[in-house]
Amino acid sequence: LPEYRELKTKYDFVNMVRTPKLAAEVTLQPMRRFPLDAAIIFSDILVIPEALGQGYHFRDQGGIGMDYLLDTKTKIEALDNTKIAENLKYVADALTLSRSKLGEDTALLGFCGSPWTLACYMVEGGSTKDFVKIKQLAWDQPDLFEMLMQKLTDGIVEYLHMQIDAGADALQIFDSWGSICPATHYKTWSLRWIHHIIKELKGRVPVILYAKGMGQKVPELMQTGANILSLDWTVNLRSMRQSIGHGAAVQGNLDPVVLTMTPDITRSEALRVLDEAGDQPGFIFNLGHGMIPSAKIECVEALMEVVTGQKNA
């Protein structure tokens, strides 16, 4: 959005995340332009590692960098998850401020990264293409891997309860790197920790689970207890909804690249997604991944026209 780009000329991303007034403003900007049913808080999944003592930044050449490499037992032991609420109060404040500006009929979503996804960034030292270090840790030093995952899981549980207390109506867990797990290890390396988090939330709010590239693992994803499965664009919604039945609602799954094309292509693809989803309750239209910076406003407007028209039909 132009208004977001204007803010970015004055403040960097991390500064906006850490400043409640700015984070709330960015959260609300899309709501002023488009007839959306829900807002998602402006933040980043890496606020958890930062709260534990491992900061993050954006590399000049692109991608995410962690302030140091989590490569020894001493460094993992030093991660402190006892001050989550204190260190992440700015997120709670941003949620409360955003909630106060939204209407009663508009939901506010909080979110976090899954323990596995966060561990990938922390152990690899940031964005990577091969994920060698995190797999080596999980295989070669399972006790140390377990320690890291437990610290992350406990911190996330506290963080999500804090988000609910601050006004979040629902929560989304992003297991963005679950797809790099060997098929035989996905449950033990990632899903069991997600299951524990959802169990500890005790049904306070609905939980959405997004696992990129894991459409073939939907039966296992459902075992986490998530209320809603968020699917990427590689999944056929019709067949997936038939296999899920009433076990969970479904969210998705327009390819974000569509919004960089033309309004006509956007309308066509949006109608295709809606047709695949069918007319049964339990479907939330969304993108299959995050918005691409080069998305065109006129395409977003075309998307809103189609989805809103379908909803009101």
Model regions and ranges:
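N-terminal basic, low-complexity leaders that serve as flexible interaction/assembly modules and, when applicable
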Residues: 1-54, 58, 64, 196, ...
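Active-site loop segments of alpha/beta catalytic cores
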Residues: 2, 87-313
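Short, basic, glycine/proline-bearing loop/turn elements
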Residues: 5-17, 73-84, 222
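Intrinsic-disorder/low-complexity, polar/charged segments
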Residues: 19, 71-78, 130, 262
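Short, flexible active-site-proximal loops enriched in glycine and acidic residues
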Residues: 38, 67, 107
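Glycine-rich, proline-tolerant flexible connector loops at the mouths of alpha/beta enzymes
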Residues: 38-60, 70, 77-84, 112, ...
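Short, flexible, mixed-charge acidic loops at enzyme active sites
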Residues: 54-69, 121-134
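A gly/proline- and charged-residue-enriched helix-loop-helix capping module
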Residues: 61-101
